[in-house]
Amino acid sequence: MKYLTILGSTGSIGTSTLTVIKQNPDKFTVRALVAKNNFTLMTKQCLDFRPSWVGMVDKRAARELKANLAQLGIAINIISGNQAACELAALKEIDTVMAAIAGVDGLLSTLSALRAGKRVLLANKESLVSCGRLFMNEVHQHNAQLLPVDSEHNAIFQILPEPIQRQLGCLSLSKYGVSQIILTGSGGPFRQTPLDALATITSDQACIHPNWSMGRKISVDSATMMNKGLEYIEARCLFNASTDQIEVLLHPQSIFHSMVRYVDGSVLAQLAYPDMRIPITYALSYPTRVPIKVTPLNFLQLGTLSFDQPDNKRYPCLQLAIEASKLGQAATTTLNAANEVAVAAFLQRKIRFTDIASVNQMVLDKINLEEPSSIEEVLCIDRQARINAHLSIRYLAL
């Protein structure tokens, strides 16, 4: 039996995780749930899973939740505020944490879980993008275990040699016969949209992904392929890969979730229909496998599967991320922060879709490339990048 805290339980990954847990009650028990402010859904989750603890970042939402649970006659410990997630990520009574709070907001609670030596299922890619080697050092220093949940990194993890799985970020890929990691991406909803029409894309259009059901921020990142760029950076950290050891390919059907090329000419791949419950289940149950109710892959019905190179003119954010990864940690931290601000501004209709890349480029052009030596320095870089991003947005709005 594994005992869990779910960070971000009311989000897309959190709700999918709870679906998997509900199908395997003999293997997983929820001890704590954490969310920002969705007390309505949290009430239902408490009713279904009866955790011992709940954390709500928003204090008003915590009060509403407490009132709802009192009416239902359910007694649960409720804490609130910015430290709630950190406290519940380090509970003594749990061994596993699903880190699914989006953005850099999820960094501190994920670090709290690592420092408590927990098994961390990482769905928050921004933690690695922002902190890189410093983040991986926390994993090793505190004897924690890190398992990737992103479908691409989870796929890569599944088809890498076991020693690399056991010591993520430490071992040489080439020593174990790996010549290249191939990250796949659908290209999002605008893969065939005329380039001159991209500036008029609305936030609602950008949030409709052709294959995946996701939150609004990650849907926009998928449309710009910044999501793939962040995954490129994350893959370098997780798998100790050089820029020459990672390739990005467009794969519109999202059946091949990633591939690993070996020195003997073999290419191993993980295939499945697009469904986040599959990588979530693998991460939850690793190193074993447990059953879940998903549609099995039917090769006779797949039809044509295609691959292509990404177009840098269509996806400038992807190229920005690749270039930032070559510059170092200060650049990737800056890019991640700038992108979060830019995407939020786009969703609020303050800038155009094509301005997201412009904001990211403008902020990167201003950075001080001195590398951070601590998490605190990372957070300082993050704050400065956000300030510069807001200034860039004001400039574009003139």
From Swiss-Prot:
Q: Where does Mn(2+) bind?
A: 150, 152, 231
Signal peptide positions (record): none
EC assignment: 1.1.1.267
Q: Give the pathway.
A: Isoprenoid biosynthesis; isopentenyl diphosphate biosynthesis via DXP pathway; isopentenyl diphosphate from 1-deoxy-D-xylulose 5-phosphate: step 1/6
Tell me the PANTHER family matching this sequence.
Answer: 1-DEOXY-D-XYLULOSE 5-PHOSPHATE REDUCTOISOMERASE (PTHR30525), 1-DEOXY-D-XYLULOSE 5-PHOSPHATE REDUCTOISOMERASE, CHLOROPLASTIC (PTHR30525:SF0)
Instruction: Provide the catalytic activity annotation.
Output: 2-C-methyl-D-erythritol 4-phosphate + NADP(+) = 1-deoxy-D-xylulose 5-phosphate + NADPH + H(+)
Q: Which NCBIfam families match?
A: Dxr, PRK05447.1-1, PRK12464.1
For this UniProt record, the keywords arranged alphabetically read as follows: Isoprene biosynthesis, Manganese, Metal-binding, NADP, Oxidoreductase
Q: Specify which residues bind 1-deoxy-D-xylulose 5-phosphate according to the UniProt entry for this protein.
A: 125, 151-152, 186, 209, 222, 227-228, 231
Family under the similarity heading: Belongs to the DXR family.
Gene that produces this protein: dxr
Gene3D superfamilies xrefs: 1.10.1740.10, NAD(P)-binding Rossmann-like Domain
Membrane-spanning ranges = none
Record-level Gene Ontology MF annotations:
1-deoxy-D-xylulose-5-phosphate reductoisomerase activity; manganese ion binding; NADPH binding
* Source organism per UniProt: Baumannia cicadellinicola subsp. Homalodisca coagulata
- Cofactor(s) the protein requires to work: Mg(2+); Mn(2+)
Asked whether the keyword Oxidoreductase is assigned, the reply is yes
Q: Which Pfam families match?
A: DXP_redisom_C, DXP_reductoisom, DXPR_C
The record describes the protein's role as: Catalyzes the NADPH-dependent rearrangement and reduction of 1-deoxy-D-xylulose-5-phosphate (DXP) to 2-C-methyl-D-erythritol 4-phosphate (MEP).
Record-annotated residues binding NADPH? 10-13, 38, 124, 126, 215
Q: Which InterPro entries match?
A: DXP_reductoisomerase (IPR003821), DXP_reductoisomerase_C (IPR013644), DXP_reductoisomerase_N (IPR013512), DXPR_C (IPR026877), DXPR_C_sf (IPR036169), NAD(P)-bd_dom_sf (IPR036291)
* Broad EC category: oxidoreductase
Listed name of the protein: 1-deoxy-D-xylulose 5-phosphate reductoisomerase
- Could you give a single Gene Ontology term from the biological process aspect? isopentenyl diphosphate biosynthetic process, methylerythritol 4-phosphate pathway involved in terpenoid biosynthetic process
